[in-house]
UniProtKB/Swiss-Prot annotation:
Compositional bias segments (type: Polar residues): 174-183
The record's note on its domains: The PPxY motif 2 mediates interaction with WWOX. Both PPxY motifs mediate interaction with NEDD4.
Complex formation: Interacts with NEDD4. Binds to the WW domain of YAP1, WWP1 and WWP2. Interacts with WWOX.
Motif mapping: PPxY motif 1: 124-127
Keyword Zinc: no
GO molecular function, one term: WW domain binding
Protein name stated in the entry: WW domain-binding protein 1
Keyword Hydrolase attached: no
Protein's gene: WBP1
Expression by tissue: Expressed in most tissues but at significantly lower levels in placenta, lung, liver, and kidney.
Chain spans, region Disordered: 169-203, 249-269
InterPro entries the record matches: WBP1-like (IPR021684), WW_domain-binding (IPR051994)
Entry keyword set: Repeat
Amino acid sequence: MARASSGNGSEEAWGALRAPQQQLRELCPGVNNQPYLCESGHCCGETGCCTYYYELWWFWLLWTVLILFSCCCAFRHRRAKLRLQQQQRQREINLLAYHGACHGAGPFPTGSLLDLRFLSTFKPPAYEDVVHRPGTPPPPYTVAPGRPLTASSEQTCCSSSSSCPAHFEGTNVEGVSSHQSAPPHQEGEPGAGVTPASTPPSCRYRRLTGDSGIELCPCPASGEGEPVKEVRVSATLPDLEDYSPCALPPESVPQIFPMGLSSSEGDIP
């Protein structure tokens, strides 16, 4: 009887030890509703059992979420830190500007770059002021008052045979208001003056203007068949500023004196 009781006690103890092992078994759903039993580990998929946690899919999902959350926290912390540094730097700049404006209020402020009154002198005008008040053009070229008017002229006459006669020397004319008429001389005499009345009708005037321009206009009385002769006049006259030299009457044109070499030197090609 004693052995029977001892045998029953050992079986109960062995059954108590095997009970946790039976509880470790896990019934997993299989393919086509055919469950299978995992002796150790966890259900992994439809046919096998997983012993370690890194073999489970939700393990990696959990770690991925944790890493992303940590990155977001670090990014927000860095942005907050940079914003605080920028605010502190701006506060220091404002303090420096305030002290410079208070202590540098003399005629020569120490913080000239921060003084708005000093910088306002370099401020350009407003756009509306520039539009409504455009800049005026420069004044025209005029002769100084009280200065005598002088004119130097040169007459070049070219014939149809491409040969030019002799050039002659002349003197300057003091003014046009006197309208003095010189006696006519022949072309062969040196130093003789030629008046506009003795100028051939078939000619054209070339006048140098104040802006270094050249006005060339044929005379209205010139004919088409006659050889064209050219008279170059450089004069600074107030009457010639607004008119063409060909539109003036013969009285207002200054006296023209030919200049050049004597006839003994021969023709100039």
